[in-house]
Amino acid sequence: MTEIFSDTGFRQLTQMFLAIIFFHTSEYILAIAIHGASKVTLSSLLISKHYALAMLISVLEYIAEIVFFPGLKQHWWISNFGLTMIILGEILRKTAIITAGRSFTHLIKIRREEHHKLVTEGVYQIMRHPSYSGFLIWSVGTQVMLCNPISAIAFAVVVWRFFAERIPYEEHYLKQFFGRQYVEYAQRVPSGVPFVN
């Protein structure tokens, strides 16, 4: 059990918790900066029961593996690759949020508001849903950084499936809001989530 307190355990778990704290805090701060404190609730922290359970399971996997298979956690090139994924996913997501400005919300809007505009510049020139792509990269990266093979696969599948269902739902409303303009945009720019058109 002392393996958890080894240099490896300390480094990887510290990086994991710092990544989680930074991600959620920055999401909340950006929401306040863009929309104003009066329009932002704690839901902008993006912490749900399912998410918390997934993170708990990943930590339990980490503890079990570092105790019974400590060598599994010593693959630094894998861990560093995961850390790189976390950073790149974070940059992509935050760039998407800042670029979209007031048009970005954590909840899918089903009614068009006055300030809504179709954002097609910046990172939106290369993908329609860069914030989703960024979160997918970030979330899988947390598990790759921990050298958690089971959770890395599970996170990839679950997060991908979530976005595979969310994107068509969201785009239904985007087509209503922006009509032909959005249809043409969607035809020439990929979603940013693999295998989701």
From Swiss-Prot:
Disruption phenotype: Plants lacking ICMTA and ICMTB have altered phyllotaxis, fasciated stems and development of axillary flowers. Its main location: endoplasmic reticulum. S-adenosyl-L-methionine binds at residues 116-119, 124, 129-132, 170. It is a multi-pass membrane protein. Expressed in flowers, stems, leaves, roots and siliques. Detected in apices and vascular tissues of leaves and roots, in the stigma and in the filaments and anthers of stamen. Not found in petioles or hypocotyls. Inhibited by farnesylthioacetic acid (FTAA) and N-acetyl-S-trans, trans-farnesyl-l-cysteine (AFC). Its cofactor is Zn(2+). Its EC number is 2.1.1.100. One of its GO terms (cellular component) is endoplasmic reticulum. One of its GO terms (molecular function) is protein C-terminal S-isoprenylcysteine carboxyl O-methyltransferase activity. Gene3D superfamilies: 1.20.120.1630. Induction: Not induced by abscisic acid or auxin. It is an enzyme of class 2 (transferase). Keywords: Endoplasmic reticulum, Membrane, Methyltransferase, S-adenosyl-L-methionine, Transferase, Transmembrane, Transmembrane helix. Divalent metal cations. Probably Zn(2+). Substrate binds at residue 166. Belongs to the class VI-like SAM-binding methyltransferase superfamily. Isoprenylcysteine carboxyl methyltransferase family. This is Protein-S-isoprenylcysteine O-methyltransferase B. The lineage of its organism: Eukaryota, Viridiplantae, Streptophyta, Embryophyta, Tracheophyta. The gene is ICMTB.
